[in-house]
């Protein structure tokens, strides 16, 4: 007797078509093109999870630099001063301080300035 695998095939196709929801044209209608696009989408997602980390680091550095320059230091001098002062605070937290708590950020910058002199 020939086995057609109906339920398994239908479930597999249904899963792919569900993932392809929202795509335009044949990419959400036809199984083969939908499958190709879903695979490509997974590739983009994998790549962009890495890019996202780069983008956020860039944003944090830009914010720290802006805050540091308002307090009379460049970004690189601030980071060097923090290293000399043994202040171990990451860029994400520094950027948050620069944006949301200017007084605390100024205190950190002053410590870095002291260490530089």
Curated annotation (Swiss-Prot):
Q: Which Gene3D superfamilies match?
A: 6.10.160.10, Ribosomal protein L20
Q: Name one GO biological process term.
A: ribosomal large subunit assembly
For this entry, the protein name equals Large ribosomal subunit protein bL20
Annotated source species: Limosilactobacillus fermentum (strain NBRC 3956 / LMG 18251)
PROSITE patterns (UniProt xref): RIBOSOMAL_L20
Q: Do the record's keywords include RNA-binding?
A: yes
Q: Which UniProt keywords apply?
A: Ribonucleoprotein, Ribosomal protein, RNA-binding, rRNA-binding
Query: Sorted alphabetically, which NCBIfam families does this protein's record hold?
Result: rplT_bact
Homology family? Belongs to the bacterial ribosomal protein bL20 family.
Cite the source lineage.
Bacteria, Bacillati, Bacillota, Bacilli, Lactobacillales
Name one matching Pfam family: Ribosomal_L20
State the protein's purpose: Binds directly to 23S ribosomal RNA and is necessary for the in vitro assembly process of the 50S ribosomal subunit. It is not involved in the protein synthesizing functions of that subunit.
């Amino acid at each position: 007797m020939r086995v057609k695998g109906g339920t398994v095939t239908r479930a597999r196709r249904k899963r792919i078509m569900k993932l392809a929801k929202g795509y335009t044209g044949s990419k959400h209608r036809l199984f083969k093109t939908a499958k190709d696009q879903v695979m490509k989408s997974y590739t983009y997602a994998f790549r962009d999870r890495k890019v996202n980390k780069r983008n956020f680091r860039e944003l944090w550095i830009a914010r720290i630099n802006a805050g540091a320059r308002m307090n009379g230091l460049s970004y690189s001098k601030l980071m060097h001063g923090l290293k000399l002062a043994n202040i171990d605070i990451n860029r994400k937290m520094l950027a948050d301080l620069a944006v949301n708590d200017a007084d605390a950020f100024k205190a950190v910058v002053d410590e870095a300035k002291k260490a530089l002199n």
